């Protein structure tokens, strides 16, 4: 096992490892040790957002390259005065390219409740959401809780008592520790296992489900996030700008087209080009 050097551990932004993103890109690029990705030269957008690609409050070295998922995010980033912004596409989109789908249409629904994290918690009525999902969805329901809520026994038991299959894709990692490099691998497998993906907020999982060829819908109480940053419009803007995804039934073709744009699925780089964009040499470690 090759241990990371101090330079590799400290010089790359820790968020580049979130959800196994760096590992997926290393695999796509054909790097010699994808389990130990080289240092990405820049900050890689680690989740879908309606801002400039950076999570609010993210420590960021001015002038560093910002590697974003879509042309739309790049335009917003430029509008905020950022430069050196490069569209690379979402790591999940590269994973889909590397993982051929079967012919199975999937069964039932996978539900992603809005979640909190180490720095912010969510307030809302999970039982109310459960009742709405049960009244709307047909077939078996899987509730996929984020690690934050999965560790809350009281919340997890609500979904278990409702008869839902309750799962968690793993821990996204934090400060270079405990990254589940197969997080998105497990998520893609679960999305393809189901016919529909739903959530009470528009989020990465909805876009991922659509890219994986699944129907998607956003409905229910969006809940409230502690000290939510409303700089870019928050939940009201989500509903206003992407109204096509809201409601119990949506048009797949329209929503799938939107998902491809948000994830940069039509702008993915080839392995050699992506290596150059990430600052990787073919040999692997620089």
Question: What positions do the PLM features span?
Answer:
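Short His-Asn-centered micro-motif
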Residues: 67-70, 112-114, 144-148, 198-202, ...
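Short acidic, S/G/P-rich loop/turn micro-motifs used as interaction or catalytic elements
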Residues: 73-74, 115-125, 148-151, 173-174, ...
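Catalytic binding pocket for nucleotide-activated donors in carbohydrate/polymer assembly enzymes
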Residues: 204-280
């Amino acid at each position: 096992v090759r241990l990371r050097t101090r330079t590799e551990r400290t010089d790359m932004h820790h968020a580049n490892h979130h959800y196994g993103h760096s590992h997926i890109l290393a695999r796509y690029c054909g790097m010699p040790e994808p389990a130990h990705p080289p240092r990405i030269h820049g900050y890689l957008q680690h989740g879908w957002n309606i801002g400039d690609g950076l999570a609010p409050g993210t420590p960021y070295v001015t002038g560093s390259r910002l590697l974003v998922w879509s042309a739309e995010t790049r335009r917003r980033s430029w509008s905020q005065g950022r430069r050196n912004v490069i569209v690379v596409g979402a790591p999940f989109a590269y994973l889909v390219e590397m993982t051929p789908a079967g012919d199975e249409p999937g069964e039932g629904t996978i539900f992603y409740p809005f979640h909190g994290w180490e720095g912010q918690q969510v307030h809302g009525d999970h039982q109310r959401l459960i009742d709405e999902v049960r009244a709307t969805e047909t077939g078996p329901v899987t509730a996929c809780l984020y690690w934050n809520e999965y560790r809350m026994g009281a919340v997890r038991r609500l979904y278990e008592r409702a008869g839902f299959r309750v799962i968690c894709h793993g821990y996204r990692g934090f400060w270079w520790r405990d990254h589940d490099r197969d997080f998105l691998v497990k998520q893609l497998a679960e999305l393809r296992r189901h016919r529909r993906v739903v959530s009470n907020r528009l989020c990465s999982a909805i876009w991922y489900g659509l890219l994986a060829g699944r129907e998607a819908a956003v409905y229910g109480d969006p809940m409230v996030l502690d000290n939510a940053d409303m700089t870019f419009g928050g939940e009201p803007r989500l509903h206003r700008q992407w109204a096509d995804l809201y409601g119990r039934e949506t048009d797949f073709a329209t929503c799938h087209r939107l998902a491809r744009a948000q994830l940069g699925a039509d702008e993915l780089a080839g392995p050699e080009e992506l290596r150059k964009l990430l600052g990787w040499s073919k040999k692997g470690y620089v």
